[in-house]
Structure formats: C-alpha cells, structure tokens
Design a protein with these regions (language model features):
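Active-site anion/phosphate-binding pocket segments in diverse small-molecule metabolic enzymes
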Residues: 1-148
C-alpha cells in the first residue's frame, strides 16, 4: 500500500479539487475555484452551423434558452456557480458557450465559477492564487511553475 505523503498530495487535499471528493476528505470544503468573466450574452440559443436545431432545443430543454460565452475554457473543471448551470455545450480554449435557463440573469463582465478536477496542473495555467475572505481579496499566493 502506498503511504506516500508529500507537500503536493497534502496541498491537494487542502484545496480539494473534485478528484479529492473522497470519504476521508468529506470534512474539507473546496478552496480552489476558477473565476472566468462573461464575454457575451444572448437571450436565445445560438448554435454555430445548426440554426435549424435552435428552436427545438429551446422548447425541449428550458435550460437552453439563454447563452453566455465565457473567457477561455477546456479546463479540467466543473461549473459550480451559478448553481445548476451545466458545463459548456462544447469545449474551446478561446471562448466556451454556456446555455442556461432564463432564470440565470448575468451580464457581460459578471463571473462564472468552476471547480477544478485536479489542482497542480490547473494551477500552472494561471497566475497567483487569490485568497478571499468574505468579499475581499486578502492575499496573493504564488504557485509552483513548470520548469523545463
């Protein structure tokens, strides 16, 4: 049995990406999220190249009646806020489309939040971690950088 414990494995247990949602860490709360701004908002579903499917999808699924494009994407992460919003319709590293119901009323420059499935690799894609308490950024923490 592997009993290896190091600062990386302990750190992952502390920030708790979804891959660490285990019985042993049930008492820990997730502490690592990706915040991404909304770039575009459409009050109808717009699917590139599939305009014929737009209206039937909106009628069939009320969660496909509004469309947001978020910055970036293709991250190893799951959408967590706003609550009940699904992962992107398709993955893109540039802009990712997020379909929602009309009850989700966000605007351009608001943020959506994702919870990473892993920690070390995802952290390499961003700058410093921002420590937040309440609604205030209280500190910045550097992350390890990949070296070659």
């Amino acid at each position: 049995k592997d009993r290896t414990m190091n600062d990386l494995s302990a750190g992952s247990g502390v920030v708790k990406p979804t891959d660490f949602d285990t019985y042993h860490l049930a008492g820990n709360s997730p502490a690592l999220f990706i915040a991404t701004p909304i770039l575009k908002r459409y009050d109808e579903l717009k699917i590139a190249g599939d305009h014929w499917a737009q209206r039937p999808l909106e009628v069939w699924n009320p969660n496909m009646r509004r469309l947001y494009y978020i910055y970036g994407g293709f991250w190893k992460a799951k959408m967590v806020s706003p609550e009940g919003v699904a992962d992107p319709l398709y993955e893109s590293t540039n802009q990712s489309p997020i379909a929602t119901s009309t009850s989700v009323d966000l605007q351009v420059d608001d943020y959506m939040f994702m919870r990473p499935t892993q920690s070390e690799f995802v952290m390499l894609q961003f700058g410093d971690l921002l420590a937040v308490s309440g609604n205030q950024i209280v500190d910045k923490w550097p992350v390890f950088h990949q070296t070659g």
